[in-house]
């Protein structure tokens, strides 16, 4: 185990990760974990649920610790047969060639991992995390206007609508000539290794939460994914991979981030929230929000105003519009 002293205050790190749409949760999470909708399936994460995932102490167990594994190649157990074993229960399990190649997926991941000096298990787990059952238009090869192009790692596949996500990702694939599975996986692996692993973001945790002050990119920037649960879910996939390959008894290096001013005990999963989340219309004064008649100065996150009230039973919130003399000339009410 390697101790990574970030030198960062924990609350400051959380506050920065709450901004700019950096941290999202899936729609299945409870409302107390959400602070407004980002896109059809994703919501801005609440402060408390973000703390749960950012607190390394919550992940120091077998099913989650692999988010701290250093992701470099190890020829002693990163074998093609081990990769094939991992892929057995995924959409990449076939002995048939991968799309528009003469190679199996297991050979592709193994060969690229050795070439890039990156764990092929990590590459396979990342694609599995991104693609699930393998039905995404990003890897179908037949999306209208982008026939014959593939983006297995979802590189640059972002946007506020599903169509934007798909077209942005496939534009990137087309611009980079990813016209077969090997080219797409090699290209994506290059992005991950050159832009992340070889630049100091060499764990799953650091690729989501860049809190490394020695990495090439400034802290809180250059983050691979928005899903705050991704490092934990990918870590479980990695653990299962090592287990299936009989590699759990191998030597691993885990790099654990350490923050300043951590809470005395691990941050728990929230079960409720007393936050009121509002989008204030243009022209209204958002500096003070009245909730049940009491004035609050809100926090600002992701173009929303967040007010923490004493309990979860708020009945109404009000903001005012003022003229040039400071006299109220209108109000907007939420109930």
Spans of model-derived segments:
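Cell-wall glycan-active module
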Residues: 1-116, 197-275, 315, 332
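Short, functionally critical alpha-helical segments immediately adjacent to catalytic or ligand/cofactor-binding
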Residues: 107-135
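Catalytic and binding regions of secreted/periplasmic enzymes and modules that target cell-wall glycans
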Residues: 125, 129, 136-257
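Short proline/glycine-enriched turn/loop motifs at strand-loop junctions of beta-rich domains
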Residues: 280-286, 313-314
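Short strand-edge motifs at loop-to-beta-strand transitions and within beta-strands
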Residues: 303-307
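Short, aromatic- and glycine-rich surface loops/edge beta-strands on solvent-exposed regions
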Residues: 314-323
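Edge beta-strands of extracellular beta-sandwich domains
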Residues: 324-335
């Amino acid at each position: 185990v390697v101790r990574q002293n970030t030198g960062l205050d924990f609350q400051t790190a959380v506050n920065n990760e709450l901004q700019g749409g950096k941290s999202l949760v899936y729609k299945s999470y409870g409302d107390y974990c959400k602070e407004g909708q980002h896109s059809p399936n994703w919501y801005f994460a609440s402060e408390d649920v973000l703390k749960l995932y950012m607190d390394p102490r919550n992940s120091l167990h077998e099913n989650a610790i692999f988010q701290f594994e250093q992701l470099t190649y190890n020829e002693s157990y990163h074998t093609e047969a081990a990769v094939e074993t991992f892929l057995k229960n995924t959409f990449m399990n076939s002995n048939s060639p991968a799309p528009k190649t003469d190679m199996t997926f297991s050979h592709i991941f193994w060969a690229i991992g050795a070439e890039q000096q990156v764990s092929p298990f990590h590459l396979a787990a990342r694609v599995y995390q991104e693609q699930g059952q393998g039905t995404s238009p990003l890897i179908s090869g037949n999306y209208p206007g982008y026939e014959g192009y593939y983006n297995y790692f979802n590189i640059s596949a972002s946007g506020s609508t599903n169509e934007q996500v798909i077209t942005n990702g496939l534009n990137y694939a087309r611009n980079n000539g990813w016209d077969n599975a090997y080219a797409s996986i090699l290209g994506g692996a290059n992005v991950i290794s050159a832009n992340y692993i070889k630049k100091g973001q060499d764990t799953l945790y650091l690729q989501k939460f860049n809190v490394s002050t020695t990495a090439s990119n400034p802290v809180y920037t250059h983050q691979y994914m928005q899903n705050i649960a991704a490092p934990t879910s990918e870590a479980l996939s990695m653990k299962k991979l090592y287990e299936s390959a009989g590699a759990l008894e191998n030597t691993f290096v885990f790099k654990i981030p350490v923050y300043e001013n951590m809470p005395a005990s691990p941050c728990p999963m929230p079960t409720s929230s007393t936050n009121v989340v509002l989008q204030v219309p243009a022209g209204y004064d958002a500096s003070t929000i009245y909730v049940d008649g009491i004035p609050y100065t809100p926090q600002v996150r992701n173009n929303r105003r967040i007010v923490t009230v004493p309990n979860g039973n708020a009945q109404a919130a009000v903001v005012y519009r003022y003229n040039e003399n400071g006299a109220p000339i209108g109000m907007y009410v939420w109930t």
